[in-house]
Amino acid sequence: MEAPLVKCLDEILDSGAVGVICADKDGLALHSAGQVQLRAAGVITALASLAKQIDPSCDTTPTIHLESDSLDVYIQQKEQVSLAVYSTPKK
């Protein structure tokens, strides 16, 4: 399972992201690459879980978009895995 995950995350980096991190349901980092901090894995998982509680009747998984002057972060949780993709903001 690890090789397909690493390949997928590397493809995300190749598409222009500056960092990517994948975490399990408990917030443990499964893999990271690029400019990310491993300690963010737990926060990413918690944010993704909380976002689902905003509208529990919704069938789709929410995507969280955090923006700053220097970084955009997209977070989404599917089944038992949370993913965050870091990119530079479009100007």
Curated annotation (Swiss-Prot):
One of the GO BP terms on file: protein localization to lysosome
Entry keyword set: Cytoplasm, Lysosome
Localization (cell): Cytoplasm; Lysosome
Pfam families: LAMTOR5 (PF16672)
Subunit-structure text: Part of the Ragulator complex.
Family classification: Belongs to the LAMTOR5 family.
UniProt function note: Regulator of the TOR pathway, a signaling cascade that promotes cell growth in response to growth factors, energy levels, and amino acids. As part of the Ragulator complex, may activate the TOR signaling cascade in response to amino acids.
Protein name: Ragulator complex protein LAMTOR5 homolog
Organism listed in the record: Ixodes scapularis
